[in-house]
Design a protein with these regions (language model features):
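Structural preference for solvent-exposed beta-strand-turn elements
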Residues: 1-386
Length: 386
């Protein structure tokens, strides 16, 4: 096999391909890029770690067709430092790969293409097309609340659903939950405006990699989703991302959201986050090998008092608020609270709560012009020590 790549094209392709490279070092082929070259100028590049993978088709001058696997990390490093505009990759019958550009050359050992794990074939008429920036934005609001090694496997990922023309995303663990729903320009796979209801759970590692791949400043860019019971494919221009799905029924999240709270607090989101970041100097300080992560909030009239104390010091701040209902004292894991506030994309927010021991809801303020989506972020408090 012999291929001549343009340096800018192959470098642009390698970066997203790394999303599908295995880091567990269990199978050598999953640490590599499968290169499949066919005459006259088509080159297909694939990475796959058994759980998720990326495939790209790029233009290249194919002098001799063939296929092989090269180390992803070494190949990406080599093509990045090559000086010439063109990079020539040659792989001989002994699986010796030679990479040449200008006066520079590198050699490395390749693997036969037959060693690459078989990629699941997905034949499905179920799916939809949506704006990339909308899907990415909804993922950004919910990713922080996904479970990690939760005993309930369905919580170790991001739940997507399409119903009544709306796209929903939900994530949840034992302490926090994020939900987002928005009406957007969805299309069926046949190009029509009729979209069948659908739902799936994408594993958290796949969520993180897909989020990177969806990054596109062009708001007209689309992502097309094809799904089956066990697997899913996202097509974004020249990039195809495929992943296994988490099987099982997602929790009935609407049932656990408390709606009728008797206390409402209205405040500036950035000002609140700034005060909590000050408190984080105390809450995230290690004392005797452990981290004291709780922050205490006291809503009294038109002031929210924020305090944190450890064996080495304390922090105190105040934020002006609008306040409906009784005064209250409540405590939270400070980092969870900050993450929830960062996910709520609004200038002013509403916090609804009832007691120091029940969950709170964080939402964009109803009067906020930025609040076009149906976003809700729920967080459980922690029990305060006397």
């Amino acid at each position: 096999m012999k291929i001549v790549f343009r340096k800018d094209i192959i470098n642009a392709a390698v970066a997203p391909l790394m999303s599908g490279v295995s880091t567990k070092m269990t199978l050598a082929a999953t640490e590599g890029i499968l290169i499949e070259a066919s005459l006259p100028n088509v080159c297909v590049l694939t990475t796959y770690d058994i759980e998720k993978g990326v495939r790209m088709t790029i233009e290249a001058d194919v002098i001799e067709a063939g296929s092989a696997i090269v180390s992803a990390s070494k190949f990406s490093q080599i093509v990045r430092v090559m000086d010439g505009n063109d990079i020539t990759l040659t792989i001989d019958d002994r699986n010796c790969a030679t990479i040449v550009s200008g006066r520079s050359s590198h050699t490395m050992t390749a693997l036969p293409a037959k060693d690459f794990p078989e990629i699941p074939r997905l034949v499905s008429s179920q799916g939809f097309t949506a704006p990339r920036h909308i899907v990415r934005g909804m993922m950004a609001k919910c990713m922080y609340a996904m479970g990690v090694n939760d005993q309930r496997p369905v919580l170790n990922g991001l739940f997507f659903s399409v119903s009544n023309g709306k796209l929903h995303t939900v994530s949840c663990d034992s302490f926090k939950m994020a939900t987002c729903a928005t009406e957007t320009d969805l299309m069926g796979l046949d190009g029509s405006e009729t979209v069948e209801d659908a739902k799936f759970i994408l594993p958290n590692k796949s969520v993180s990699e897909l989020y990177k791949l969806l990054n596109d400043k062009d708001e007209d860019s689309l992502v097309t989703v094809y799904m089956s019971r066990k697997n899913i494919i996202f097509v974004m221009g020249d990039i195809t991302f495929f992943s296994k799905l988490i099987e099982g029924e997602y929790i009935d999240y609407n049932r656990i959201i408390l709606r009728n709270h008797r206390i409402k607090i209205f405040l500036d989101r950035e000002e609140f986050i700034s005060a909590l970041e000050h408190a984080a100097l105390i809450t995230e300080e290690k004392v005797a090998g452990s981290v004291r992560s709780h922050v205490r909030l006291e809503a009294e009239g038109s002031v929210l008092k924020i305090s944190a104390t450890s064996g080495t010091g304390s922090a105190y701040d105040e934020v002006a608020i609008g306040h409906e209902g009784d005064d209250i004292v409540i405590a939270f894991n400070n980092r969870y609270l900050i993450d929830s506030l960062r996910a709520c994309n609004a200038d002013r927010i509403k916090i609804s709560l009832s007691s120091p021991l029940t969950s709170i809801n964080i939402e964009p303020n109803d009067d906020d012009s930025c609040a076009t989506d149906e976003d809700l972020f729920m967080l459980l408090p922690v029990r305060m020590k006397d």
